[in-house]
């Protein structure tokens, strides 16, 4: 996870656990740490309703970056989103923001710790979503959001081409 100055902190990093079954996996964290312009993980939400998706994400990341006080998101990705979320009696600001890199979400925690996640579209086919999660999780180097956007576009184009062949 990143500190305000862009450096990474190992403290609070998630412990390595047995991987979730592939068909159930919705979140992957970078094992390579992070760097400027790179993501800390990838997330494949089940819907485009940020209000229903955010509570679980906040609960998970609060353990790693401290109490989350603000979430910024790319409004293009979500059909509906709350302006705030209440967790344990505290308000969390949820703000649309034209992110530097599309298809990302930022979580701001305590002590200037943040997490930036690449968001795989909820409607993405499972095979593409899992390839994106694997790319982030298995990379030996931090992965830039721009690289993920490019790879997602390539995988989507390949899937569309295969679908056209199957339709013939």
Where are these regions (language model features)?
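Helix-rich interaction surfaces within compact, conserved domain-sized segments
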Residues: 3, 79-168
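Short hinge/gating elements
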Residues: 39-43
């Amino acid at each position: 996870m990143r500190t305000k100055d862009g450096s990474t902190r190992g403290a609070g990093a998630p412990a390595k656990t047995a991987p979730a079954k592939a068909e159930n996996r919705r979140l992957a964290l970078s094992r390579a740490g992070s760097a400027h312009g790179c993501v800390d993980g990838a997330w494949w939400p089940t819907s485009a309703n940020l209000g229903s998706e955010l509570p679980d994400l906040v609960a998970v990341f609060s353990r790693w970056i401290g109490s989350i006080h603000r979430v910024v998101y790319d409004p293009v990705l979500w059909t509906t989103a709350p302006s705030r979320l209440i967790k344990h009696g505290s308000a969390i600001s949820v703000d649309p923001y034209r992110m530097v890199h599309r298809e990302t979400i930022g979580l701001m925690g305590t002590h200037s710790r943040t997490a930036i996640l690449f968001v795989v579209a909820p409607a993405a086919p499972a095979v593409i979503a899992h390839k994106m999660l694997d790319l982030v999780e298995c990379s030996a180097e931090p992965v830039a959001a721009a690289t993920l956007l490019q790879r997602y576009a390539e995988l989507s184009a390949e899937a569309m081409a295969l679908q056209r062949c199957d339709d013939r």
